[in-house]
Amino acid sequence: MVKFNNIIYDPQVSDKKFPVQASDPEREAKLVVLQPVGYPFVCNLMEAPRIDAVNKELFEIYARDQWEGFRAAEGSYLFDQKLLPDYAFKIIRAHPDGSKITRNTSIILLENDREEFHEVRSSITMDDVIGQEDAKIKCRIIMKYLEDPDRFRDWAPRNVLFHGSPGTGKTMLAKSLANELKVPLYLIKATSLIGEHVGDGARQIHELYELASKTAPSVIFIDEMDAIGLDRRYQSLRGDVSEVVNALLTEMDGINQNWGVVTIGATNNPELLDKAIRSRFEEEIEFKLPDDEERKLMLEKYIETMPLKVDFPVDKLVKLTREMSGRDIKDRVLKTALHRAIAEDSESVRAEHIEYALKERKVSGEPKHMFA
């Protein structure tokens, strides 16, 4: 039974509308994900059934048999014609969208009480990521692999570790990588892989990789890797965490040949990762704090979009924001200063507002939690 309960809401991409390309009605659907919805209407003489696919293979055969030739468009509905006439299933995911269901289409049924796991879509490009030139160069190797997985085979960069200070662009670069190649990106937090019951976490990992394989080439981005992969010297490993780690190692080892799937793990503290997990990453990519020139580019880009004019020299801001990440500059300096100016009904962000933001940041200090 398939469970996808790791949806990541990303306001940067979730609230945007993405144009759907004109579909080819003869193009074969590789994957269709369905969610049980129910009947168009019910009366007090009948009770809406709970739909659970006890046997996934049998459900796929059953579904393909009655819906072969139907067009699978995301957001549309398919109605059962056999066991439960007129019972509706919503098409949550179709890959590619608007394609035709055939005998070769993989069909997955979500549980009634679970939210679907879905890909994150983004319009971010590598040019939007300021700095991190070394990381970008290494990411182009991943791009070459995803463009032609069959060419690389055993030489593929399948498991890559992004590490560095918070807010340095690890997630942003992964989004740009997937967007430029137009491949699915599955973005999850490691802590969400720990299930409520024994076996839940391992099952979710295997099902995640199954989904990624069926939509390959694709990218799986696991954030906060140290939350589950912490070195055993620093924790008493719980059974539910251990099963998640073992399932993840199985997938990363390639026991199930997930050709065309790249796993990117992200952590702020690579030295705290368990050796068994860290050794599975063939490539480690460091994300560094921006230098003076990079901070200047960031500041100019951010200030250009602010709702109030900034009456403060950019060059001076560059010096005042040394050792800060791009996220710190935007959220903890510029945003705090902007909100202070708005609260005072000021027509611009002035020196005193910048000074207030810098003072607030100094008072609050850096987060001490190792997973921050």
Curated annotation (Swiss-Prot):
Taxonomic superkingdom: Archaea
PROSITE patterns given in the database record: AAA
Nucleotide-binding recorded as keyword: yes
Keyword annotations of the record: ATP-binding, Nucleotide-binding, Proteasome
Cited InterPro entries: AAA+_ATPase, ATPase_AAA_core, ATPase_AAA_CS, CbxX/CfxQ, P-loop_NTPase
Keyword Nucleotide-binding: yes
Membership in a protein family: Belongs to the AAA ATPase family.
Descriptive protein name: Putative 26S proteasome regulatory subunit homolog MTH_1011
GO CC list: proteasome complex
